[in-house]
């Protein structure tokens, strides 16, 4: 995959909605600007002098306060801010148009038509699954893809769109002033998933704690899948996910997920009666600790605020695992995935690196207290809220397809 900023999302309700569209649009834009700041060689045509204003525009769109130095908000500053807003709006319009090209190509191909017309309806009903579109949006420097993608639908139903300059398709390459040289690629494929209305917690998995954390945590960098491969190869056979840590105590996130822990704040005897969250809190790492801001992570944090659930935005500590009663990881595909056990190296490597795990042969184990009354009820409660959050804050695909501005 070419080096650049990317995000992945999917549809739900049989392709009628795109999951948390505004979140993913802002995240891939922010990732592009952060990568351009950290790795200017990837985007040589993005002027460094504009990156601060462009990032401020994204933070404002996400509802974050942007502070200016005293006396700085003068006419020049206001003009630069307006310019940055227009540039971000133009960039995001190009991303949106590229997504629509990919979705249209997907739904017009014969393979998708057969799915939609129900040729595999009986099989899907038996599996209680729906066919959805999985979208990957990639922003990279001009020519970074090296012609490695094609505009032709693949037999499996995958569609990859080329930039406009090479494929002649409008809306698939950035043409905004001062953002020239950034190309938009969208890959659309199909995924079978359980309908939201009948979604339940999947069987729990085991996760291994390894590390270190991401080098560019706030940006979704396309080189990460290659970097994480060393961890996936070296993890114990029973582990389905890897939880990242830099020091062997603070747990940051999974390699494709965010991590949550339900922990006791009072002795177990004091929490046996009363509301389900009495004497408990939810824990997840902060963005400042070096994690990628996930869409489901944010939905769960919002749920805690709306429902009065105690939450500590701080990396869960392995040394406090005696207080843990539930654990789960989240992402856009699995939504909420319970974790029943975690493995930790008995000795944390002194020279930590992504390729330093082959020699680890002894692991400590945390096992979830499955005999606790109502085990899993708090994770289920949060899953139900997230489903409602997804439905309320996601974009109707038809609205995007019919919007021309």
Name the predicted role of every residue range:
Residues 1-82, 97-101, 117-123, 140-405:
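Helix-start/capping segments and mature chain N-termini
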Residues 85-119, 129-131:
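Signature of the catalytic double-stranded beta-helix
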């Amino acid at each position: 995959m070419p080096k650049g900023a990317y995000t992945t999302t999917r549809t739900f309700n049989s392709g009628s909605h795109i999951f948390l569209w505004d979140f993913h649009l802002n995240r891939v834009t922010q990732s592009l600007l952060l990568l351009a700041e950290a790795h200017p060689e990837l985007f040589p045509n993005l002027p460094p002098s504009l990156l601060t204003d462009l990032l401020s525009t994204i933070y404002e769109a996400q509802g974050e306060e942007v502070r200016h130095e005293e006396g700085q908000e003068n006419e020049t500053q206001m003009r630069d801010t307006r310019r940055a807003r227009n540039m971000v709006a133009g960039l995001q319009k190009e991303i949106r148009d590229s997504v629509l090209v990919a979705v249209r190509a997907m739904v017009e191909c014969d393979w998708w038509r057969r799915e939609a017309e129900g040729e595999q309806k009986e099989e899907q009903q038996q599996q209680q699954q729906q066919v959805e579109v999985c979208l990957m949006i990639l922003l990279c420097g001009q020519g970074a893809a090296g012609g490695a993608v094609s505009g032709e639908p693949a037999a499996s139903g995958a569609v990859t769109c080329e930039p406009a300059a090479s494929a002649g398709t409008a809306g698939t390459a950035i043409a905004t002033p001062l953002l020239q040289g950034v190309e938009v690629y969208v890959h659309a494929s199909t995924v079978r998933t359980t309908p939201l209305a009948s979604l339940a917690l999947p069987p729990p998995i085991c996760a291994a704690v390894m590390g270190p954390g991401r080098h560019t945590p706030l940006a979704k960098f396309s080189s990460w899948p290659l970097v994480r491969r060393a961890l996936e190869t070296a993890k114990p056979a029973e582990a389905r996910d890897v939880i990242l840590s830099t020091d062997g105590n603070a747990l940051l996130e999974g390699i494709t997920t965010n991590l949550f822990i339900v922990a006791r704040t009072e002795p177990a005897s004091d929490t046996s009666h009363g509301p389900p969250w009495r004497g408990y809190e939810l824990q997840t790492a902060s963005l400042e600790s070096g994690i990628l801001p996930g869409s489901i992570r944010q939905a769960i944090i919002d749920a805690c605020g709306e429902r009065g659930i105690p939450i500590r935005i701080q990396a869960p500590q392995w040394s406090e695992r005696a207080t843990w009663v539930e654990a789960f990881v989240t992402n856009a595909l699995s939504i909420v995935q319970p974790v029943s056990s975690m493995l930790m190296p008995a000795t944390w490597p002194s020279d930590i690196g992504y390729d330093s795990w082959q020699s680890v042969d002894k692991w400590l184990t945390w096992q979830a207290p499955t005999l606790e009354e109502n085990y899993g009820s708090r994770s289920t409660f949060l899953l139900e809220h997230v489903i409602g959050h997804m439905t309320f804050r996601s974009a109707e695909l038809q609205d995007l397809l019919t919007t021309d501005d």
